[in-house]
């Protein structure tokens, strides 16, 4: 009898069981989309890399061995997306090397990474419809051109605890409602904050996703500059997200169209996992 392993079936049914982890995230995002408020705007789906902290400020500990999705509002913890400058540099180096290698012949992925370096300034104003909501106006720091003016409505978050990794992550779904009347906000009396966060953003794009590595500089009430470093991945085309979500499970659509949403979320989750698994030591 041969001691070598023969080809094996995926299962006794000849198919691979559904990945419940990815399906759970896909179900969550899909539910947020179909139950969102009836307002104009884009649905933003992003994953931020960070740490889940307990009430004492330390990294949360759970008696699980592998990556785990937490039920919303089930555990008293907070998610912190800030990383150290050393982590920021680590990811910057990693992504820059990836951009260079992705343009070489024989690269594992057929799609190279693109790159843009942005310098942005955010300003926040009160919303007339709701004092708790803020209107965010983003300008190009060099030209002063408004690149975005909108109100962000949080729809929901899913926290993912990764005990074997140096970082955790969070999936967030938001509705970005455009606000066209930004021109009327022209005096300092309209500002909510006395600080205007400056964003130094290195934005990498690959296929249907944007990966943003951002240094945010603001001034606290004492006048001391505060610097935060963040890493996030976002689905790049909200229109594609909504169109695939609309056909998910639609038996009148082709199999390819029915499965497109889950395939998009699968790639989104895999990219978030790759970033988390490449996190080095040195988080706050």
Regions found by a protein language model. Give the residues of each.
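Phosphate-end processing signature that detects enzymes handling 5′-triphosphorylated RNA
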Residues: 1-284
